[in-house]
Structures are given as C-alpha cells and as structure tokens.
Amino acid sequence: MKCEQCGENIGIGGRRGRTPRFCSSACRQKAYRSRKAGTNSTSKSLVEVFPEPMASVTNWVRADGKRPLCVDGTPASTTSPTTWSPLHEVLSSSAGDGFGIMLGNGAGIACHVLSNALDGDGVLVDWAVKVLVGIESPLFVEVSQNRRGLHVFVKSDERPGARRIMPGGGRHEFYSKGRFIRTTGEVFHLTRFADMRNCQ
C-alpha cells in the first residue's frame, strides 16, 4: 500500500483496525491543506471519472471516515435525500476527509461490495474473479478506501440487500437502497474479464 500524498510504501493495518492512508503526519497535513484548497481542476477531473448515470444524480455526500456528511459538515442520512447534493457541490466542499454516494431514492444505482477481494499485492483473489465475471455490464468499478476491496456499481432497481461469506475472510454484499458507499474514484479496470466472460 502507498501513501496517498507522496506515494511512499506503507504497511497495512493501524490503530483501531484502520488502514493508514499516509506515511507521516506531515503528509497527512499536506493532504488536509490540499483538500481545503479544493481546486476546480481536481473537482472537474473527479466528476469525469464517474459515468454519467452516477455523476448526474444528486445522491452524493461528504464523508468523515465512514460517516456521511452534508456539504456544510453536518450529519447526512441515508433516509433523508435533502441532506444529499450533486457531485460537483460535494467535490467543492472541504467537509470531512472524503466523499461517497447514497444508494436509493430512485437513482437506479446499486453496488456490489467485495471485501478482501484483493491480496496484499493488489491482485484479485480467486472468488472475486468468479464474482466479477458474473456481473453483467458494470457501470463503474473502483478500489475501496482500504485498498483490499472493490466497489462494483451497476444499474438496478431497488431490492433487498444480500450478503455472502466468501473464502479467506472475504464478503460479497449487494445494496441498492438505504446504504452509504464511501467512494475513492480509483478505477479498477475490467478489460481483461471480457474474454473470460465470452469463454463461459
């Protein structure tokens, strides 16, 4: 795993079970100042990362860890769409330490959450390969914040969630409503899975 600020290699694991994002307090401070500055070019580039069906909805919020926030820093709720905002407004806010999307309220977007889908080198484990091959037409796939999981966003009607325990401590969860997904915008490319799907 690498420091989000300088790219230096850092270990996995930390206090209270959190995976560290920065190699030092200096890098943490630099990242904080960059977030506060919030340049328009950074916001524009992140908006362009997400596909139109996601970027166009008003289901976005800021985040402090895994806790959703409004753009003004007050708590946001999965059941209160008035606390959500368009993506460009969320990216222009400096509240918290990140951002994410709320699922539901007719947005037509769902998410497969694959926990522990990547090994320590960022390589897909076997069960995750099988799950990914079986997901039709993903909208967007990203690496999760702890860099050991994936978020696979798809178009979907709202329906009950599901959870499966997978080998090696993995989990495959599916949500389409009443759920906050903290996003990273770090694309995980699935080009190589096209041939695998066609061979089945």
Describe the function of each predicted region.
Residues M1-T39:
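BZIP DNA-binding basic region
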Residues P20, S34-Q200:
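Conserved phosphate/metal-binding and DNA-contacting active-site motifs used
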